[in-house]
């Protein structure tokens, strides 16, 4: 089993480049199934396990997919299979995003009920409600969701009960080839939604209003391949911004888009962090003393739930009492217990956590409970006394490329090792930590 070992106490300095956005590239690759003519070339694709998984799904469905040099080439002009089995979908719940394109392109989709990360129930009822409104017949049973329509999907007016990102993406893709106009209301406004709409419009689609609460899609008869550049990953950018702040560092986060990070920038500045827009990215300078704040996660443009655990690590360094309220997902405080193992003063009260700081974090062996928690525990390790050993790295690898190497390049004392190949010196250091 692999683990990351962090020896705390180093200030981070330098420049780090942000990868293409994981949460943008997965729906864009899925949307490539809509193109019945020509191949698509998707650029700035991060080399993440989730990307390899969605590529496997498309190959299984009959598309020709190549991935090299951060470019994914997809040719989906062939006859497509319409079933995505559990062996693929269990690895990543975003696999359900092939449902909209398959239904629009072929009139049929059979997709295993999704797996993926363990953050609450994350139901897909909003996806199915939308498909039904467009004329599809839905059956759920034996571990599968099956959707079928005779002829083309029909344009419809659809109101989402919650601005679900996945439902918004799936319904945009389904509506792109539907007959007539589809109006989606109370939709997600994330930058990744805008990126998907731009991609489909480049393929010949007619989508207006992405990034607002209402999106109108005028269906077309066919779409073609196109070359597209993925937007930078705002969550990776935010994670490195927190890394700079927590270590009293000075880091240029190259590729960070200020307009995608408005709420995070506001909250970090409220804590006393200096953030400067330098055109090519954001420079983040951490203060000697951080101020306590309250955060409530909300759908975009509110504070992103995917930055909640990283900010919890930062708030442990703030002088006073802070509160984080999680409104997007239930059961997303599992990392709080891991922070407690590192001497964090955290109390969970329903959907909120109370954080008392500042505390001197202590190195410990901790487990990543989900993707963002893994990054947050490493951030805590950057300022912990002694050694922090983070396990369950499979979660981290779903969302970050070379995370430990990028931190090391900024000055962190960090390495990734196999338990079996851990050096004798590292084992001695671990014993020293435990005896301290």
Curated annotation (Swiss-Prot):
It is found in: Cytoplasm. One of its GO terms (biological process) is cell division. UDP-N-acetyl-alpha-D-glucosamine binds at residues 93, 122-126, 306, 328. GO terms for cellular component: cytoplasm. One of its GO terms (molecular function) is UDP-N-acetylglucosamine 1-carboxyvinyltransferase activity. CDD domains: UdpNAET (cd01555). PANTHER family: UDP-N-ACETYLGLUCOSAMINE 1-CARBOXYVINYLTRANSFERASE. This is UDP-N-acetylglucosamine 1-carboxyvinyltransferase 1. The gene is murAA.
């Amino acid at each position: 089993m692999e683990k990351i070992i962090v020896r705390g106490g180093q200030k981070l300095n330098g420049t780090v480049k942000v990868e293409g956005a994981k949460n943008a590239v997965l729906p864009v690759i899925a949307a490539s199934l809509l193109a019945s003519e020509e191949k698509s070339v998707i650029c700035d694709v991060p080399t993440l396990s989730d990307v390899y998984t969605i590529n496997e799904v498309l190959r299984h469905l009959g598309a020709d997919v190549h991935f090299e040099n951060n470019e994914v080439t997809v040719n989906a002009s062939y006859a497509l299979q319409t079933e995505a089995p559990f062996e693929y979908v269990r690895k990543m719940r975003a696999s359900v995003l092939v449902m909209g394109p398959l239904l629009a392109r072929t009139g049929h989709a059979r997709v295993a009920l999704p797996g993926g990360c363990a953050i609450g129930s994350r139901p897909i009822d909003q996806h199915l409600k939308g498909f039904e409104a467009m004329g599809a017949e839905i059956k759920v049973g034996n571990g599968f969701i099956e959707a079928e329509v005779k002829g083309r999907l029909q344009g419809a007016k659809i109101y989402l009960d919650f601005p679900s990102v996945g439902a918004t993406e799936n319904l945009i893709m389904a509506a792109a080839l539907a007959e007539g106009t589809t109006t989606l209301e109370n939709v997600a406004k994330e930058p990744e939604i805008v990126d998907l709409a731009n991609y489909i419009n480049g393929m010949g689609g007619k989508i207006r209003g992405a990034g607002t609460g209402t999106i109108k899609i005028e269906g077309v008869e066919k779409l073609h391949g196109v070359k597209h550049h993925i937007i930078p990953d705002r969550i990776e950018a935010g994670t490195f911004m927190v890394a700079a702040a927590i270590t009293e560092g000075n880091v240029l986060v190259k590729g960070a888009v200020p307009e995608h990070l408005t709420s995070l920038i506001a909250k970090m500045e409220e804590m006393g962090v200096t953030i400067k827009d330098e055109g090519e990215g954001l420079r983040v300078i951490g203060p000697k003393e951080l101020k306590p704040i309250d955060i409530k996660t909300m759908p975009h443009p509110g504070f992103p739930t995917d930055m909640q655990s990283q900010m919890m690590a930062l708030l442990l360094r703030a002088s006073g009492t802070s509160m984080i309220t999680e409104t997007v997902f239930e059961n997303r405080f599992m990392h709080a217990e891991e922070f407690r193992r590192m001497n964090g003063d955290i109390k969970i009260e329903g959907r909120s956590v109370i954080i008392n700081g500042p505390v001197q974090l202590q190195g410990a062996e901790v487990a990543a409970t989900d993707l963002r928690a893994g990054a947050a525990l490493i951030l805590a390790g950057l300022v912990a006394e002694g050694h922090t050993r983070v396990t369950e790295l499979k979660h981290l690898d779903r969302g970050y490329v070379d995370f430990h190497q990028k931190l090391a390049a900024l000055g962190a004392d960090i390495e990734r090792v196999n338990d079996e190949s851990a050096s004798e010196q590292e084992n001695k250091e671990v014993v020293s930590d435990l005896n301290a």
